């Protein structure tokens, strides 16, 4: 966070006062006079001024907008942060809740003797999440897409080299009982 510090300024009566580069004061036109030079004002304010706490500035990013608050006491800022943290905890605890099946969401029947509390007694009732058909079938769709891709890639490789190349040399031909016709059948 950037703090903006106001520079002390000398008051000017009836004209325009301009500070030159070395910190002195100069008067442009008019009949007024500069009450104090800027150097005098700075030195007296530094000696007499107590270290004051600059006003707190709070910047909030919410809903796509930026809001800046100046001069908030630190107690209010801490309270706002506590409220925001509590809201985030509540939001996270409800969003992490497990998805339950419809059978678990049924209210207990009147003939039931179990001591399980009804869903209405829960502080945050579990809402069943409805999935779109495309969202629910997404892993299967990915699998089918991958399978189609691999088939097309295999077809491209086969079309590029339709016949397997043999790296056999004449010395690699077996000399045993196996004939060449059995090892490399034609047709």
Curated annotation (Swiss-Prot):
Compartment(s): Nucleus
Protein name: Protein TIFY 3B
InterPro entries assigned: CCT_CS, TIFY/JAZ, Tify_dom
Subunit-structure text: Interacts with MYC2, AFPH2/NINJA, TIFY10A/JAZ1, TIFY10B/JAZ2, TIFY11A/JAZ5, TIFY11B/JAZ6, TIFY5A/JAZ8 and TIFY9/JAZ10. (Microbial infection) Interacts with the pathogenic Pseudomonas syringae HopZ1a protein.
Bias-annotated ranges (Gly residues): 14-32
Keyword Kinase carried by entry: no
Job of this protein: Repressor of jasmonate responses.
Lineage per the UniProt record: Eukaryota, Viridiplantae, Streptophyta, Embryophyta, Tracheophyta
GO biological process, one term: defense response
């Amino acid at each position: 966070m950037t703090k903006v510090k106001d520079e002390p300024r000398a008051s000017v009566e009836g004209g325009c006062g301009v500070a030159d580069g070395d910190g002195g004061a100069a008067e442009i036109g008019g009949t007024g006079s500069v009450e104090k030079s800027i150097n005098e004002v700075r030195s007296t304010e530094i000696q007499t001024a107590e270290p004051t706490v600059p006003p707190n500035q709070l910047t909030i990013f919410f809903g796509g907008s930026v809001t800046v608050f100046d001069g908030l006491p630190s107690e209010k800022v801490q309270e706002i942060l506590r409220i925001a943290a509590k809201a985030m905890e509540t939001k996270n605890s409800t969003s992490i809740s497990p998805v339950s099946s419809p059978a678990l969401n049924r209210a207990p029947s009147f003939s039931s003797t179990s001591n399980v509390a009804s869903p209405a007694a829960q502080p945050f009732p579990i809402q069943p999440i409805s999935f779109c058909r495309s969202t629910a079938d997404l892993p299967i769709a990915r699998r089918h897409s991958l399978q189609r891709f691999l088939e097309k890639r295999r077809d491209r490789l086969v079309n590029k080299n339709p016949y397997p190349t043999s790296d056999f040399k004449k010395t690699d031909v077996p000399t045993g009982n196996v004939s060449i016709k059995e090892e490399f059948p034609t047709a």
